[in-house]
């Protein structure tokens, strides 16, 4: 959805029934963080009038059955998880000469004279929402440098899963091994830093220099530099929003049929966090440069109702990728979101979804995160050759 401030959202299925979404309340603080959104709690209700806050980019896949299979666009946080994240969230370090590494490091060389773009202090039309920049805390199940937010009833043993190899075999033989695509192709970012976000500004764009396609381009470059075959499919799937996951599924299947060597599919998204009074910008500093925090999502199908029987194989890849991202910088990656949903991750045993920043991160920050993620992905895949 384009705006956060709607109290009630009406969603129509093919049968025309109107359903309400119930979500959690917004936690308000009076200190560094004005508020942190409680993410969307996916519940289909009838005859109830619960206050609803929606996340930008929400999409209902076509039909109620698909809703149960794919879930909603954004996963949710429980009240206790939000409270803990807010209590442990930290401010983003200032960028100074001392924060810039003196050695060539992952994603950026010190020889690069990085200069961030000038901030935009323009006062736009509409309601102004202060942008709260923070590092989202690693809250959840922990093992070494891996943190998982487990929203399922599965008793996850991270160490045990790491002991099993993913069902992915990578070859550097010139054939496509990875497919990068975007279910919500229009999810976009800010051109430059802003103190406030305005209700008149768009959170979606067809400009490939400002939306998630730009992030996919950075990941693609890293894979190509490493000699790993990759296809970056930029098909628009979210116009209209309804049925986007159905259309991206068709794109995946077309690419798999044309290129059966593909082992891994990555659905690159942009997240959205905030409430009635603020927008959250998850950011960290790596090698003296701001990067948007990212989040990997891996699905679960405990009762077999989602048609995702091999979810554990996908999780094993996700955990290794999470670990390699954390090896770059612990604050680079938010907790892995292990959730009761499918999101087209049943396409292959190496299918995952990754969220880059939010709508108030800059395109510069998320492109840098795409480079860093690309490095972690290369390292993960090269270990599976």
Model features per residue range: what roles?
Residues 1-19:
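N-terminal Lys/Arg-rich, disordered targeting/topogenic segments
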Residues 26-261, 272-275, 371, 382-385:
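N-terminal catalytic or cofactor-binding beta/alpha core of small enzyme domains
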Residues 183, 192, 258-301:
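Active-site microenvironments of hydrolase-like enzyme catalytic domains
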Residues 185-188, 236-241, 270-275, 301-304, ...:
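Solvent-exposed loop/turn segments at secondary-structure junctions
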Residues 225-229, 260-264, 292-293, 331, ...:
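Loop/turn elements at helix/coil->beta-strand transitions in domains of secreted/extracellular proteins
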Residues 252, 277-284, 336-342:
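Alpha-helical scaffolding within the catalytic cores
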Residues 310-337:
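Active-site-adjacent substrate-binding region
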Residues 332-385:
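Active-site-adjacent mobile loop/cap segments within catalytic or ligand-binding domains
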């Amino acid at each position: 959805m384009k705006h956060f401030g709607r109290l009630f959202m009406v969603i129509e299925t093919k049968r025309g029934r109107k359903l309400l979404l119930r979500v959690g309340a917004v936690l308000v603080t009076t200190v560094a963080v004005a508020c942190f959104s409680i993410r969307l709690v996916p519940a289909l209700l009838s005859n109830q009038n619960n206050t609803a806050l929606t996340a930008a980019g929400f999409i209902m896949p076509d039909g109620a059955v698909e809703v149960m299979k794919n879930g909603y666009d954004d996963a949710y946080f429980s009240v206790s998880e939000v409270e803990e994240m807010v209590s442990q969230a930290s401010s983003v370090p200032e960028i100074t000469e001392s924060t810039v590494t003196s050695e060539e490091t992952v994603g950026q060389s010190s020889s690069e004279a990085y200069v961030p773009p000038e901030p935009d202090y323009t006062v736009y039309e509409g309601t102004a929402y202060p942008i709260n920049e923070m590092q989202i805390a690693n809250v959840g199940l922990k093992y070494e440098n891996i943190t998982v937010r487990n929203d399922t009833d599965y008793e996850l043993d991270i160490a045990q899963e790491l002991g099993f190899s993913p069902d992915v075999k990578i070859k550097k033989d010139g054939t496509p091994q990875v497919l990068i695509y975007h279910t919500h192709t229009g999810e976009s970012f800010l051109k430059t830093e802003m103190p406030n976000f305005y209700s008149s500004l768009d959170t979606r764009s067809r400009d490939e220099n400002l939306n998630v396609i730009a992030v996919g381009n950075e990941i693609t470059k890293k894979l190509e530099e490493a000699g790993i075959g990759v296809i970056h499919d930029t098909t628009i799937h979210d116009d209209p929003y309804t049925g986007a996951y159905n259309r991206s599924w068709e794109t995946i299947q077309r690419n798999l049929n044309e290129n059966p060597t593909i082992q891994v599919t990555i659905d690159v998204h942009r997240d959205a966090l905030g409430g009635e009074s603020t927008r959250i910008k998850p950011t960290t500093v790596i090698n003296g440069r701001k990067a948007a925090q990212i989040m990997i999502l891996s699905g679960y199908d405990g009762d077999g109702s989602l048609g995702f029987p091999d979810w554990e194989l996908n999780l094993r890849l996700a955990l290794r990728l999470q670990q390699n991202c954390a090896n770059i910088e612990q604050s680079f990656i938010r907790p892995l979101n292990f959730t009761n949903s499918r999101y087209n991750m049943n396409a292959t045993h190496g299918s995952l979804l990754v969220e880059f920043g939010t709508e108030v991160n800059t395109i510069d920050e998320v492109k840098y995160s795409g480079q860093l993620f690309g490095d972690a992905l290369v390292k993960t895949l090269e270990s599976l050759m």
